Amino acid sequence: MAPAPVTLLAPGAASSMSCSQPGQRSPSNDFQVLRGTELQHLLHAVVPGPWQEDVADAEECAGRCGPLMDCWAFHYNVSSHGCQLLPWTQHSPHSRLWHSGRCDLFQEKGEWGYMPTLRNGLEENFCRNPDGDPGGPWCHTTDPAVRFQSCSIKSCRVAACVWCNGEEYRGAVDRTESGRECQRWDLQHPHQHPFEPGKFLDQGLDDNYCRNPDGSERPWCYTTDPQIEREFCDLPRCGSEAQPRQEATSVSCFRGKGEGYRGTANTTTAAYLASVGTRKSHISTDLRQKNTRASEVGGGAGVGTCCCGDLRENFCWNLDGSEAPWCFTLRPGTRVGFCYQIRRCTDDVRPQDCYHGAGEQYRGTVSKTRKGVQCQRWSAETPHKLQALTLGRHALMSGTRAWKWLRLPCHDFAPAPASVHIYLRTACTTGGELLPDPDGDSHGPWCYTMDPRTPFDYCALRRCDQVQFEKCGKRVDRLDQRRSKLRVAGGHPGNSPWTVSLRNRQGQHFCAGSLVKEQWILTARQCFSSCHMPLTGYEVWLGTLFQNPQHGEPGLQRVPVAKMLCGPSGSQLVLLKLERSVTLNQRVALICLPPEWYVVPPGTKCEIAGWGETKGTGNDTVLNVALLNVISNQECNIKHRGHVRESEMCTEGLLAPVGACEGDYGGPLACFTHNCWVLKGIRIPNRVCTRSRWPAVFTRVSVFVDWIHKVMRLG
């Protein structure tokens, strides 16, 4: 039997139950939202209510739908601010979800309103308990006379709990310890806050559920009570031990970055004694990512045990993915110290511990010599006083502690006026001795040592093997690439068989990408609104030079996108997995991935490609190709005022407007190396498109190539 038609409110009647005023509970708290989604009923005899165009926002729609017994969901048109009330949900018979570019779907949280997400386990038709029913897991039945029924699964009598401080909690608890209802994260009343879901994409800020986006003691939320800003939620911890870890542990040496080290070393390299761990109530911003409850430095607190991070006693451990084991110290003014004196396990051989050429571009984290002696910090003056090296474009200055990296004005220790390149720490901000080769020594990277009897020595690095590329990075150039001014702004006709076109649900090109494996595309994070957005209807087009190829064009391959995985923090990368592998041929080819941490030498000519805006310089309906010279980050930061990071790279800004524009983002910066084209950069948005003499910025792929390989390996 078809559901009864929706009863509509007269426009004037909506005011008594429409959008909430500041200090009141929002009616949208009763709904869960699916962005970019419409709900359709397959029976023509069943029709939704008419569109109401007199609503202020989605809250007012919720206020109209909530009191009606026959309204279970509504569409909200984000463009026209229209509202359509619905007498069914996605769980009703003969209904289906349809991805849309104009509407958001709001469904009641009641018995019908449980939306499957990547984390809540609502899969297929399995028994679940999304509403915490005391009877245990249940499901909707296929019997028209029985709406839902318990699955009679025996209870284990284990309460819902959170590990550690609950930063990974993604459940559906939406009330605080005192019973107050939580405020929606996407609303700014009754309490204003900085945790907008669109800015904290990895924190699971769904609807009004309890979360812990700031590393607090446990999950919490803003309340709907205007007098009480925020409260913790009633979620107990899962026992007294920390969440189980998967790393292989060692007690006498460490592997990798030392995440699995559980030894008893309690002094730093500089012999500062580690402080005993005690709990603190708030984590300072600069140490938030350490996810610890460690002691305040210099305090005389007694011994304590920390849940988040398993900090027992005062040992050097690495619980946050830093470059090596570390601890908080008792030395005033030195908050954190690294314990580099702990030896590395003999079976720990890291492929990235190698250098190319003479090692001038090495930016790894090795900090010991070939004899195992710890390197002296470049900023230190003991046991060896560093000598000034003025060698061509580079300089390593001593006699001051005002060390800088990048091309910045020198301080009082340099001849005025002056601006020199200063090498210091170039890959991370947590400390350590990164080892460049500032004087071009042909024997490789070196450092001053902590041994007073040995001024310097070469580092425990090997020369990287010759890079071997097999079936990637090969192409047959089909078009003349000499002088014709078409394509990318200032570009020319070209062939880039690994450059793909990303298409939205309407089949429109919106970004470029690179084919790095038969079933994997690498592109820019900024091409997508969220890391968890619905991908139904999104496709990748390959094998064509044209932005709008003719129907039946030979060689064109259209493959749906199956899933999306966002890269590490700060990478601005996304990997897209396709529903099936593509067919490789002359029109479709893989581009090679670079070695880890490889730095492209300045002056290298590389190629960008895409179908984006040409700014009037040519035809933007075909593939855009242009050649650009790579420049050093030091030179790039002169224009970008020091904002270019080590995980990014630049190409020079030319007098003519040549570069990538809207629609080219996510596309490759390909360099010809070892007779193959290698993916060195991914184009990310800049403030302007092809600004004259303005360097373009790319994500440096070699920094994140280990993550790329891991994702593709695990699928």
UniProtKB/Swiss-Prot annotation:
Organism in which the protein naturally occurs: Homo sapiens (Human)
Disulphide-bonded residues: 127-151, 161-238, 182-221, 210-233, 253-345, 316-339, 354-464, 375-447, 511-527, 606-671, 636-650, 661-689
Main location: secreted
Lineage: Eukaryota, Metazoa, Chordata, Craniata, Vertebrata
Signal peptide positions on this chain: 1-20
PROSITE patterns from the UniProt entry: KRINGLE_1, KRINGLE_2, PAN, TRYPSIN_DOM
Keywords: Disulfide bond, Hydrolase, Kringle, Protease, Repeat, Secreted, Serine protease homolog, Signal
GO molecular function annotations of the record: peptidase activity; receptor tyrosine kinase binding
Domain of life of the native organism: Eukaryota
Domain Peptidase S1: start-end pairs: 488-713
Record-annotated Kringle domain positions: 63-156, 160-238, 252-345, 353-464
Residue intervals of the PAN domain: 21-110
UniProt record, GO biological process: proteolysis; regulation of receptor signaling pathway via JAK-STAT
Keyword Signal: yes
Family per similarity comment: Belongs to the peptidase S1 family. Plasminogen subfamily.
Protein name: Putative macrophage stimulating 1-like protein
Localization, UniProt: Secreted
UniProt keyword Cell membrane present: no
GO cellular component, one term: extracellular space
